[in-house]
Amino acid sequence: LRVGIVVFDDAEELDVVGPYDVLAAWAATSALRPEVVTFSADGAGVRCAKGLRLVPDTSRDDVGPLHVLVHPGGQGTRPLTRDSEHLAWVRAVRRETPLLTSVCTGSLVYAAAGLLAGRPATTHWSALDELAELDRSVLIDTEARYVDDGDVVTSAGVSAGIDMALHLVARLESPDAARQVRREIQYDPAPPV
């Protein structure tokens, strides 16, 4: 079971490391032995939206087959929605990968690639109009933390990626496994404000 997280310049940090932490914690204890890898277009390091530098494991050409793709969001998704090479790659991955997921504005890339046509999806609250502009047929859920539509799971903004990743653990292994990961990362949201 291979999970790949694509990274790119101006990706939102928590969109990448939130799901990564959940999935890596799962991989450390699961009998399924999932492998979690990060990759960029060319394998080179990227600088995220707030300045964090990430060095991925590999390139998208060398990442190999995936069972799950996680596409983060952030300001870097805006150029990707117009990048014909990236969109063609996303479409190719769709044909070979059983489960596509996105965090935050990663869903904008999926919409631009035509992968959300007529499907329910969500994104960061501030990008709901952008999602509608990219594809008017998307059934936008403005309230959900994540939307599971079978072979595509989209999540709302930033921290919602953690919720979505815990959902993936529950879906791919069991709710008990997800609870164990949640306890391990001590995730019990009760915002102070």
Regions found by a protein language model. Give the residues of each.
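Short, glycine-/small-residue-rich phosphate/pyrophosphate-handling segment
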Residues: L115-E133
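A short glycine-threonine-serine/GTX helix/turn-capping micro-motif
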Residues: D151-G157
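A short beta-strand/loop micro-motif in the catalytic core of glycosyltransferases
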Residues: L100-T101, A121
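Active-site rim beta-loop-alpha module in soluble metabolic enzymes
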Residues: D148
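Extended, subdomain-level signal for the structured scaffold at the beginning of enzyme domains
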Residues: L1-L100, S107-A112, D129, L139-E143, ...
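Active-site-proximal loop->helix
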Residues: D135-S137
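Small/polar loops that bind or transfer phosphate-bearing groups
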Residues: V7, T123, A156
